[in-house]
A protein has these predicted regions:
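Catalytic histidine-centered segment of alpha/beta-hydrolase-like enzymes
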Residues: 242-251, 255
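Active-site loop/oxyanion-hole signature of alpha/beta-hydrolase fold enzymes
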Residues: 11-13, 41-48, 54-95, 99, ...
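Conserved serine/cysteine hydrolase catalytic core
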Residues: 176-230, 235
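Alpha/beta-hydrolase active-site loop signature
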Residues: 34, 58-62, 125, 243-246
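Conserved alpha/beta-hydrolase catalytic His-Asp/Glu region
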Residues: 130-133, 146-196, 201
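Flexible "cap/lid" loop of the alpha/beta hydrolase fold
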Residues: 105-109, 116-146
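Active-site glycine-rich loops that stabilize anionic/oxyanionic intermediates
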Residues: 24, 32-35, 98
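Alpha/beta-hydrolase fold catalytic core
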Residues: 1-27, 49-51, 89-90, 233, ...
Length: 267
């Protein structure tokens, strides 16, 4: 299947979505920081054979408006609600990776009537961390952007499926390849998240939840155990030989885990 572009507007901010169509329960896919909806293409196609699938370019990223004035976590949550409302989506399954997973957790906690199930990929509720924005800015500063070619970008981002997934998020201008986001906006978004504690939000989530982790996860086993103790029902699974972007690295495995989880939810 192919996707259709859908545009949602909330408080003057345009949010661009890839609507893959499909029948059955609705899945809303949320990418991570500095990402784009196209990251989900390898998953969205197969998933749309059994589900309605919508992938969102979150505010400030991808094809959505690049300079929103509000990049608080509240804004990202209300964007998800607006996408569901304006596209007529009810009782959705939220699938989010990294910062998209964080937005998914907060949405499920604050809008339980909207979310029937939650798939969190390489994400945690987090907490105050004053060093995090500096770390992210240094990471962006390390990018040799603009890239001389798409191939150069693929190699910089590690090659293979992960490198291609990140390179697909760039845009070609004047023979060079540029990020489709503003670095300061992304750092500001992280800074907002780093100022607050969201631990209580995890315990407010009431829907069935799958926590999907990479073998080389930034979330420690002890932290996973804590999350599992604090909230039931939650399932966790670690995917062997994967890193943070496992949805790019092993989309077939991620697809199988999501499908199996949702079959149990529907049973």
């Amino acid at each position: 299947m192919t996707w259709t572009e859908r545009v949602v507007e909330r408080e003057g901010v345009r949010l661009v979505c890839r609507d893959w169509g499909g029948d059955g329960p609705t899945l809303v896919l949320l990418h991570g920081l500095a990402g784009h909806a196209g990251e989900w293409d390898a998953l969205a196609g197969p998933l749309s054979s059994a589900y309605r699938v919508v992938a969102v370019d979150q505010r400030g990223q991808g094809a959505s408006d690049r300079f929103p004035s509000d990049v608080s976590r509240d804004a990202f949550v209300e964007d998800v609600v607006a996408v569901a409302d304006q596209l007529g989506l009810e009782r959705v399954v939220l699938v989010g990776q990294s910062m998209g997973g964080h937005a998914a957790i907060l949405t499920a906690a604050r809008h339980p009537e909207l979310v029937r199930a939650l798939v969190v990929i390489e994400a945690d509720v987090g907490g105050p961390d004053p060093e995090w924005p500096t770390h992210i800015r240094r990471w962006f500063d390390s990018w040799p952007a603009p890239f001389a070619s798409r191939d150069a970008a693929v190699q910089f981002f590690g090659g293979g499926a992960i490198g291609m997934g990140w390179a697909d998020g760039l845009e070609e201008r004047g023979g060079q390849w540029w990020p489709r986001f503003d670095q300061d906006v992304m750092v500001q978004s992280v800074a907002d998240a780093a100022r607050h504690s969201f631990a209580h939000e995890w315990e407010r989530v009431t829907c069935p939840t799958l926590l999907m982790l990479a073998q080389s996860s930034f979330i420690s086993p002890a932290r996973v155990d804590e999350l599992m103790r604090r909230r039931v029902p939650t399932m966790s699974v670690s995917v062997r030989e994967t890193r943070h972007d496992l949805h790019l690295e092993q989309p077939d495995i991620v697809y199988g885990l999501i499908a199996h989880f949702l079959a149990d939810v529907s049973a």
